[in-house]
Amino acid sequence: DNSRLFAYLADGETVLRKHPNDKVVNVNHLGNKVVELGTTLGNLFDGDVPFEPGCRVVIPLRTSGGAVSVENCGECTLKDVHIYSSPGFGLYEQGGNGGNVYDGLRLIRRPNTNRLHASSADGFHSKGCKTGPRLINSELSYAEDDLFNVHGSLDYVYDVIGKNKLLVVGHYGISTDVGTSVDFYDLESYEYKDTATVTAVTKLSDTVYMNNIKDVSSFIGSEYGVTVRTMPDGTFDMYEVTLDRDVDILPYDWYIGTSTSSKNTVIKNTYFHDGPVRGILMRAPDSVIEDCTFENISCSAIFVCLSRYWYEGPIANNLTIKNNVFKNIVCGVPGSESSMA
């Protein structure tokens, strides 16, 4: 349910150029090998390549985790790891000091087979590390979602309980260590408001707070028109934060630190190809993308943004992108033919 739908020509080598967010909402088996698919957009027939008998269809059934998971680790090196199939992420990295090195990682369809996809989610997904990954001499392809996605979290102010004391909702921990700075941004406009230094952090366990957090997404959606997802149980905590000075902020303003932002991510000499969504989704500051090739990417080769909906950030400030090659990019929207990133 709610999985993306992908269509290939009969040879399995050419994905039909279409928007990748046409999702399957229901599947009805009509018998005699006939299946009726209900989708959100219904635009499978809008592309300039015909969808006809003989075409092959993929409906990934995504699960959590990855074929290879690296969690709460630091300065590990994975050399020449080849991943041919994963029910979730190809490689999943979360938490810890980070700075892990992936040299010669390949996410590809198993050679000499007729497989269509190599993973049912992002090819490489990294989040919440103190230092981001170093991906070198690698190849990522045929993932169901972004080929590479790296980010920290967007936390938010739950309440202002004193001139320099806040209650903060952290997503998978909190994005600031004691002694580091935090930036505040307006909930609606995302305009910068203030900066302060964190002097104390205390994790709270009040069940009333935890239950109230579940209602925040619907409240700010109705009151402010800002759409964010409901945080699933086990993915958030409440913190009391003390700052070094007063700040002029409001409840639900964004609380942005970089302690767990996967900063200093390095991506070099890597081949990104045949991605039905984006090549690199970059949200980690102080990062480098260099000497890479992007080919046959349905959406942007490199997409730099934050996501309020997914609570993913912070902002990829001080990002260096140089000496990369782009071939046949943004080819997944009907009627488009572009080599721009």
What are the residue ranges of the model-derived segments?
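Active/binding-pocket-proximal capping segment
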Residues: 285-287, 294-309, 316-324, 339
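Extracellular polysaccharide-degrading/modifying enzymes targeting complex plant/algal/animal polysaccharides
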Residues: 1-84, 93, 109-117, 141-263
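Repeat-solenoid scaffold signature
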Residues: 128-142, 185
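Short, T/G/N/S-enriched strand-turn elements that build extracellular solenoid repeat scaffolds
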Residues: 68-72, 80, 89-95, 134-139, ...
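Short, contiguous acidic/charged loop-to-helix segments that flank catalytic cores in large enzymes
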Residues: 171, 253-258, 277-278, 307-314
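Short "repeat-start/strand-capping" segments in structured domains, especially the N-termini
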Residues: 73-77, 95-101, 130-134, 263-266, ...
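Short glycine/acidic-rich loop motifs that flank beta-strands on beta-rich extracellular proteins
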Residues: 64-67, 87-93, 110-122, 131, ...
